[in-house]
């Protein structure tokens, strides 16, 4: 369809935002080559650093460490930097962000229930018809679908949740799968929220009195891990998807889909993902991901 449209209008250049996956970029490259036209790829505004910038940063380094890339970006954009040094004298306050859920003195605020508009309801019906067996239950759908509403969710996080985000970001609770997590990543990933604006808003909360360990930990998730993993992806692809460092061969067990296992941590992580279509990074890293690593999957 795209090829036909380009020929019909005699276009000489195809301009696109940098795709999110290598396959799409390859397809666009092959298409424009076949048509004999130029391909102009613009940086993806959903990310702060470009694939080209990350490649330049990585060049010549024996090992690529997220922490060092994160520090480099902090300096570049002057985030939590005073007199060319990190605020608080440290780059990373993770040592303060591993508090047990048993130490929690207050329940997390109730998340406001979002009433879907007519268009969202129509889309939800289509999703149920086509993807009814996939993870997620539409009865639990509680996501904003406009920029204005996504910004309201960001403000709710900064006003009600960020103070406890840091200490309890690695904690898990059977009765509350989201705790003090921001739930903002989907909005950033689809372009409803600008990552740098969210980082600046978080930094502002620090100067208004929010704990540094919470603010720094939150910023690191976006400026550090999100940017670093994306950079690694584009640096290593297409070979990256077929790498198997540990040479593991076991397949995922059935309970990764059903949640039916006596291991309660795994069962609850899978069950909440099935219900919400969402899983925060500790569920993924320390439960399902860690199980897969230890089980040689």
Region locations from a protein language model:
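A generic structural signal for short
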Residues: 16-17, 172, 258
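Beta-rich, aromatic/charged-enriched effector core domains that present basic-aromatic interfaces
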Residues: 2-143
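Residues forming well-ordered secondary-structure scaffolds
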Residues: 23, 64, 68, 149, ...
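Glycine/tryptophan-enriched, flexible segments
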Residues: 77-218
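Short amphipathic alpha-helical segments, especially helix-boundary/capping motifs
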Residues: 4-5, 131, 159-161, 172-178, ...
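Mid-sequence acidic-hydrophobic segments that form the walls
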Residues: 31-34, 157-160, 225, 272
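Active-site-proximal binding-pocket segments
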Residues: 183-184, 188, 193-297
